[in-house]
Amino acid sequence: MITYSLLHMIDTLHTEEDCRVYLENMRWNGKPICPHCGSISEHHYKLTKDGKFEGLYKCKDCRCRFTVRQGTMFEGSNLPLKKWFYAIYLFLSHKRGISSCQLARDINVTQKTAWFMLHRIRYNVKDDDANFNDMTQVDETYIGGKTKRNKGGQGRSTKQKTPVMGLLSDGLVYAKVIKNARSKVLLGVIDELVRKDSTVISDSWSGYNKVKNEYIHEVVEHSLGIYVNKDGFHTNSIEDFWSQLKRGIIGIYYLV
């Protein structure tokens, strides 16, 4: 897999023209596609301004004008593509997240603009059609609110926290806010996303007891101090995701 450093990105995508050409190559591969009628052609008209082409096309079939930004997160934004590309890079490279205040400082925009950019980026990287096959780790956690100790100092209350369920397979994570962590709710999420002949790996929480009725169920007995079961299965990856998520929240938000 090819990876790029920020310095490589700065050198390669140095100007707005560089960024536009890069985006056109990634989206169209040399054949611009009209977003209005779907016409694919190397011969759409290139419209110039003061003798210079700046990425505005006119469809040879429906005669509508378009740019490579249309149909992307960049549509309707007057920000240079270079700032968008840098924002995407910073968003993806900060595994614990990046705040709108920090992004604003990094790319020299207002906090309001950075907030808008981050929301567009998050919306475009989400995957609502995730499907999990083969081996899937599942776990639930509680996020947000203030942690309060119960009377007598025993345990911690989760009444002010929001339950979230997570599924992980082959590096893909799906997290969903759930009503509660009872069996009916947990199984509903699993049934929605996981293929029936798959292996589901969980801890020994009773909410997963019925998983074995529909899936190959591997249990890791955390309550016994076991974190890898006798067959080598674990839930370490999804738990690491929770850890990164919570650290990101602590580092960016005052309260969730």
Which residues does each PLM region occupy?
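Residue-level recognition of single "structural anchor" positions
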Residues: M1-V256
